[in-house]
């Protein structure tokens, strides 16, 4: 059985730590309790759009990837109907950079209109490539409403239709962020060559 320690910060963030001194890396995972089920029926695809926007930089850090790569880290994310999950891997000696980056975008995400336009285009192309430009690609978009008549699972994570992303405004984006992207709506898991006390110290400094 995997051993772990758990604690909750005053701001509501739940933290789980698994100590493994046999490795030289550390993994930091932040799971937000928001997925496509939380979207309005007339504004779908926002959870997935935010998966992209969270890599667009913050008020303090123009590029999320660059400082992480400089310390030997890598990252990725995924969205489904229930959650949005972000994770990074770094050499354990550089875990402080991971805490800094995750806390900064949680608290100070940039709402630069240029970033929104870039990521909007990326998501629209992904929508077209996966669902609209393939033979029978839209079958999943059509089946979901037949299966889930009233439940918000009735639309795909990427959205019900392209127009919802095309028409997303900066105000829509801000509203979605401040409703769901907060410490008390997230769980952070840290694993690798770290100690619980070290994690507590670093996380309380930035959050």
Model features per residue range: what roles?
Residues 20, 29-31, 145:
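His/Glu-based metal-binding/catalytic segments typifying zinc-dependent metallopeptidases
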Residues 25-27, 38-40, 96-98, 198-199:
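Short acidic, gly/pro-rich beta-turn/loop elements at beta-sheet edges
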Residues 20-22, 33-35, 58-59, 91-93, ...:
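Solvent-exposed coil/turn segments that connect beta secondary-structure elements
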Residues 1-24:
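N- or domain-start disorder-to-order transition segments that initiate the globular core
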Residues 23-25, 61, 183:
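A cross-taxa feature marking solvent-exposed loop/turn segments within ectodomains of secreted
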Residues 4, 8, 66-207:
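Charge-rich, well-structured scaffold segments of protease-associated domains
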Residues 14-16, 29, 85, 187:
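Residues embedded in well-ordered beta-strands
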Residues 27-89, 155-158:
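M16/MPP (pitrilysin/insulinase) zinc-metallopeptidase core fold and M16-derived inactive scaffolds
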């Amino acid at each position: 059985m995997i051993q772990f320690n758990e604690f909750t910060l005053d701001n509501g963030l739940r933290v789980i730590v698994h100590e493994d001194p046999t490795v030289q890396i550390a993994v930091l995972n932040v799971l937000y309790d928001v997925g496509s089920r939380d979207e309005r029926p007339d504004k779908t695809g926002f959870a997935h759009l935010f998966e992209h926007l969270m890599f667009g930089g913050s008020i303090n850090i123009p590029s999320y990837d660059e400082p992480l790569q400089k310390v030997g880290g890598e990252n990725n994310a995924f969205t489904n109907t229930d959650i949005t999950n972000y994770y990074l891997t770094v050499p354990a000696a550089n875990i402080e950079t991971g805490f800094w980056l995750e806390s900064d975008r949680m608290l100070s995400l940039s709402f630069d209109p240029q970033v929104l336009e870039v990521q909007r285009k990326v998501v629209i192309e992904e929508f077209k490539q996966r669902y609209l430009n393939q033979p029978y690609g839209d079958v999943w978009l059509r089946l979901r409403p037949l299966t889930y008549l009233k439940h918000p699972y009735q639309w795909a994570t990427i959205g019900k239709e392209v127009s919802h992303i095309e028409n997303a405004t900066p105000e829509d984006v801000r509203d979605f962020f401040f409703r769901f992207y907060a410490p008390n709506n997230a769980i952070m898991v840290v694993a690798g060559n770290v100690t619980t006390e070290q994690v507590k110290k670093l996380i309380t400094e930035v959050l």
